[in-house]
């Protein structure tokens, strides 16, 4: 353990020396990310921090080691900036009234959330529900109260199951889990089709090529693309789960 700590310290020192010119920028970016994170949590965003693992494979694809995935300061910084970019782009194009793909997370079903509230009462927890609806801030406060308790993992999973699945839509109806009025997937065009499609729209718009014909084209294309990409996402998640089971 001491040897690992020493290696980490030496690696950190080497990085600081190698990227010395960028350190002030990184520190400023970290400060900005903390402000963004605080603002997001204040409005009620829910952070499901489930433990994840990564499976190390050999050259033949056989598992040789399973390591916990560490969510460190760097990954959180990237996440905060990514979320801010996604929200900014979504709001900008919503007000421009241009056909677009949004990442939507609808409010939980009234009956599901009521059943969840009844269930957690058995563990001494409560959930404020007004007019059949719950604010994401209530879920956030519940998970905060349960943090560090034996039932934390169970309550987190039950809370997640009480919510609807996120999907792609052409209507901007907000993202419940992030407590965001505007949200899209913009930051990963190299690995997600919705992001790539959005980049195409943005590029055409910036170059002044979004005339009536192109707007009509996207108006017809995007509803089908939203349904198709949402269904592909479900299949990809299922394939990922099955692969992890097989490798473990």
Model-inferred region functions:
Residues 1-248:
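Conserved, carboxylate-rich catalytic/transport cores that coordinate ions
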């Amino acid at each position: 353990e001491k040897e690992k700590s020493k290696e980490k310290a030496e690696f950190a020192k080497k990085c600081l020396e190698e990227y010395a010119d960028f350190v002030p920028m990184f520190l400023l970016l970290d400060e900005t990310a903390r402000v963004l994170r605080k603002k997001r949590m204040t409005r009620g965003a829910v952070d499901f921090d489930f433990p994840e693992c990564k499976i190390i494979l050999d050259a033949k694809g056989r598992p040789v080691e399973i390591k916990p995935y560490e969510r460190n300061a760097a990954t959180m910084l990237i996440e905060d900036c990514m979320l801010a970019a996604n929200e900014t782009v979504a709001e900008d194009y919503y007000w421009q009234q241009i056909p677009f793909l949004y990442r939507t997370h609808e409010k939980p079903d009234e009956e599901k959330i009521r059943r969840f509230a009844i269930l957690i009462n058995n563990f001494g927890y409560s959930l404020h529900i007004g007019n059949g609806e719950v604010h994401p801030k209530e879920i956030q406060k519940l998970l905060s109260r349960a943090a560090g308790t034996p039932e934390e993992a169970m309550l987190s999973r039950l809370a997640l199951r009480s919510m609807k699945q996120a999907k792609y839509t052409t209507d901007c109806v907000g993202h419940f889990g992030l407590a965001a009025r505007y949200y899209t997937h913009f930051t990963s065009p190299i690995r997600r089709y919705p992001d790539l499609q959005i980049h195409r729209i943005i590029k055409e718009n910036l170059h002044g090529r979004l005339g009536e014909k192109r707007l009509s084209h996207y108006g017809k294309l995007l509803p089908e693309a939203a349904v198709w990409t949402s269904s592909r996402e479900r299949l990809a998640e299922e394939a990922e789960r099955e692969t992890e089971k097989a490798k473990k």
